[in-house]
Amino acid sequence: MIMAAGSTGERPFFEIITSIRYWIIHAVTLPAIFIAGFLFVYTGLAYDAFGTPRPDSYFQSSESKAPVVTQRYEAKSQLDLRTK
């Protein structure tokens, strides 16, 4: 087969996205990826996987606002006092 200059030998993108085979495969995989991502976040597994606190655990129940660190070099000790 003789290819045109500059051709990589791959099918043109337009030909791929207009094929029935492409849409049969992607009609299943694209919604499946979306649903998997939704469930990953909705079930809380994303919080566990990445070690992020859940929205209801950012503040302690006794606090009414976000904790503020006032001394730059004593931040660790201030946060330790907060968690006790």
Swiss-Prot record:
One GO-annotated biological process of the protein: photosynthetic electron transport chain
This protein's GO CC annotations: photosystem II; plasma membrane-derived thylakoid membrane
Cell compartment(s), UniProt: Cellular thylakoid membrane
Co-factor: note: With its partner (PsbF) binds heme. PSII binds additional chlorophylls, carotenoids and specific lipids.
Family label: Belongs to the PsbE/PsbF family.
Gene for this chain: psbE
Main location class: membrane
Keyword Ribosomal protein attributed: no
Subunit structure: Heterodimer of an alpha subunit and a beta subunit. PSII is composed of 1 copy each of membrane proteins PsbA, PsbB, PsbC, PsbD, PsbE, PsbF, PsbH, PsbI, PsbJ, PsbK, PsbL, PsbM, PsbT, PsbX, PsbY, Psb30/Ycf12, peripheral proteins PsbO, CyanoQ (PsbQ), PsbU, PsbV and a large number of cofactors. It forms dimeric complexes.
Protein name: Cytochrome b559 subunit alpha
NCBIfam families given in the database record: cyt_b559_alpha (TIGR01332)
Top-rank taxon, per record: Bacteria
Keywords: Electron transport, Heme, Iron, Membrane, Metal-binding, Photosynthesis, Photosystem II, Thylakoid, Transmembrane, Transmembrane helix, Transport
SUPFAM superfamilies: Cytochrome b559 subunits
Function: This b-type cytochrome is tightly associated with the reaction center of photosystem II (PSII). PSII is a light-driven water:plastoquinone oxidoreductase that uses light energy to abstract electrons from H(2)O, generating O(2) and a proton gradient subsequently used for ATP formation. It consists of a core antenna complex that captures photons, and an electron transfer chain that converts photonic excitation into a charge separation.
